Design a protein with these regions (language model features):
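Bacterial N-terminal signal peptides that target proteins for export
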Residues: 1-6
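Conserved functional acidic sites
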Residues: 30-251
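C-terminal motif of bacterial Sec signal peptides marking the signal peptidase cleavage site
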Residues: 12-15
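Bacterial signal peptide processing site
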Residues: 17-19
C-alpha cells in the first residue's frame, strides 16, 4: 500500500513538473552573407570571381567576361541581396541582385550599367524577386512567378505585370564542356519572360559550383548573345585568387 502511494506521488510530480524545453529554429547561418549553405550551393560566395571564355576549350586573355560576387547590400525596404557584377575588361556591364529565401534563389533587380536602366521585380511596394532555383532543383522543373516588373530609366519608370518562367533541363555534353573542366552533370536554365526585360536566354548551372555557362545580351532590349563558358574560378584577395579585378585575371 505504501509502495503504491509512493508510485502515485512520483507520477503526479513528473506530470506537474516543468515541460522539456525545445530549441527554436535558429534559421540559416548568415555569417558569410545571407545563407551560407545556399550560397555554397549556388556558387554565390562573397568575392568569388568566375571568368569566362567564348571558347569551350581555350581560355581567353583577358577573359571575355567576369562575374564577381560582391558583399551583401541592402535595397529599399530592407531587402538584403548579393550583387553580382558582370565585367568586361574591368568595366561593369550589368549587375544582378540576388536574394535567398527558404534556400531558394531569387533575382530581385537587374541593372544595365551606363544606360540608367534597371528592372526590379515587385509585389505591390515589396521587392520580392523572381525565382531561379531551389536547393534541390532537378531537370524538368518550372518555377513561375507572376509579378510586376518596374523598369526604371534615367528620369522615369513604369511598372508592367509580368510572368517570369524558369524551366530546367539536363545540360548537354557540349554545354558542360568548358576551358576549366568538363562537368559530368548540370542543369540548363531556360527563361521565358512575358513581356521580356533583358532576361538571359540560357544558363547552365552546376550545383555547388555555380553558373558555368552564361548567354546574355547584357541589355534591357533583346540583342545578340554569345554563350560564354567558365575558364577560371578564384576568390579575389585570397593567396590563390590574386588581387586582379574580376575579368582581368590571367588564364
Amino acid at each position: 500500500m505504501r509502495l503504491a502511494a509512493l508510485s502515485l506521488f512520483v507520477f503526479s510530480m513528473s506530470a506537474c513538473g516543468p515541460k522539456p524545453t525545445t530549441t527554436a529554429d535558429a534559421g540559416p547561418d548568415t555569417s558569410c552573407g545571407l545563407d551560407c549553405a545556399a550560397q555554397a550551393r549556388y556558387g554565390l560566395i562573397v568575392e568569388r570571381c568566375f571568368e569566362y571564355s567564348e571558347s569551350t576549350s581555350t581560355p581567353q586573355d583577358p577573359p571575355a567576361l567576369g562575374a564577381w560576387v560582391r558583399p551583401v547590400f541592402t535595397l529599399e525596404g530592407g531587402v538584403k541581396v548579393l550583387p553580382v557584377e558582370y565585367r568586361v575588361n574591368g568595366q561593369i556591364k550589368m549587375i544582378d541582385s540576388f536574394t535567398i529565401r527558404d534556400g531558394n534563389l531569387y533575382l530581385v533587380r537587374r541593372e544595365f550599367s551606363g544606360t540608367g536602366q534597371s528592372v526590379t521585380y515587385k509585389t505591390g511596394m515589396d521587392l520580392t524577386g523572381v525565382q531561379w532555383l531551389a536547393m534541390e532543383s532537378g531537370p524538368g522543373e518550372t518555377y513561375t512567378t507572376n509579378t510586376d516588373a518596374f523598369v526604371a530609366n534615367t528620369s522615369s519608370g513604369v511598372s508592367t505585370p509580368t510572368t517570369y518562367r524558369m524551366t530546367t533541363a539536363d545540360a548537354s555534353a557540349s554545354e558542360l564542356k568548358t576551358p576549366l573542366t568538363t562537368y559530368t552533370s548540370g542543369l540548363k536554365l531556360l527563361v521565358g519572360e512575358t513581356p521580356d526585360h533583358g532576361s538571359d536566354p540560357r544558363r547552365v548551372f552546376v550545383p555547388d559550383v555555380g553558373f558555368v555557362l552564361i548567354a546574355s545580351s547584357f541589355s534591357l532590349l533583346p540583342g545578340t548573345t554569345v554563350p560564354l563558358s567558365v575558364q577560371k574560378i578564384r576568390d579575389i584577395g585570397s593567396p590563390d585568387g590574386g588581387s586582379e579585378g574580376c575579368s582581368l585575371g590571367v588564364p
